[in-house]
Amino acid sequence: MKAINAICIVLTTVMTVQLSFAQLSAKYKTYEQKWSKGLRYGLFKPANYDPKKSYPLVLYLHGANDTISRDITWYHESIQSENPTFVLAPKCTNPNQGWGNTWTDVHSPAMVKTLQVIDSLLARYSINKNRLYVYGISMGGFGVFSVLSKEPGKFAAGYAICGGSSEAAASKLLNTPLWIFHGSDDDVVGVQYSRQVYQEIKKEGGQVVRYTEYPGVRHNSWENVAREKTLHRWLLAQAKGKTTNSPHSVDGLKAKLQNDNTVNLTWSTPTVEPKSHGTVWYYKIFRDNKLLTEIDGDLSDFTDSDSNRGMHRYHMIAVAYNFKESTPSSFVNVTIP
């Protein structure tokens, strides 16, 4: 426990622009700073809020000692214009307790107050209780695992960046869609805190979890996450009680040996039914029946530049935003001289 507390009190610089409250409120007319029972929090309301409509809410949990108001991406017009969303950004001034963790059975005081604020917002605004989301960085990443394990069914989905969890909590994390991010060379929060709980979730049958590890990246993996172009769409595609179909199998997979002995794969983009669910989230590419890589679903080609000599067999699986997978594609063979 002491090791976890030591990790959580490290100062974390996050992937956002630092602004004063005055600057934020000037830039975003619907951003307010409020207090509730000693908890300071920022609340971003969608522009042109209409109580007759229903809106999602995203909860952001910051890292240790990072209590400054920040211009997070969820406020940006590029997201809000397509998906008007409430954003709640509470501030935790006690990094020794933080947002909680999965090594304890109770919420931290800051998380207790945050959940009370969420309940008050649900009562006051037209927020869809089936579309509550949470994400966090470092100390906030630990908080994501903590609140999802202690409040099963409250949140529709979440993502955790350079945080972590005990493996023992895996059984409580099986049913909430979760995307875990970590840098392989994290020098503040060891990658094992994310890697091992992911492996345990999968071992226990979890089907709605994804793990992305960035090779050679240290604690600042939030910079890589900021470049994940499907992240916001994936999160908002999740909703409690929502049912959707699986994507079609990848069609027309072809493999061509290039002059430099790399292998270029091309395919036709499959659709997902119903069409309203959107395009494929990502593809799994397999070489010789082993997972080679995962790539975004809007791509239709990939070059394998790391194959040894000999014959190699490739196939693919399409994964929808609901985690459902297609049947495997046909296999294609390539021989590298």
Describe every region a protein language model picked out.
Residues 240-278, 321-337:
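Pro/Thr/Ser/Gly-rich low-complexity, intrinsically disordered linker/stalk tracts
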Residues 20-57, 135-137, 142, 147, ...:
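A domain-start/cap signature at the N-terminus of enzymes
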Residues 48-53, 98-138:
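Gly/Ser-rich "nucleophile elbow"/oxyanion-hole loop immediately N-terminal to the catalytic nucleophile
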Residues 304-324:
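Beta-strand-rich modules
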Residues 57, 64-113:
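Active-site machinery of serine-nucleophile hydrolases
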Residues 54, 270-288:
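Solvent-exposed loop/turn segments flanking beta-strands in beta-repeat/beta-sandwich domains
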Residues 161, 177, 181, 187-248, ...:
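C-terminal catalytic histidine-bearing segment of alpha/beta-hydrolase fold enzymes
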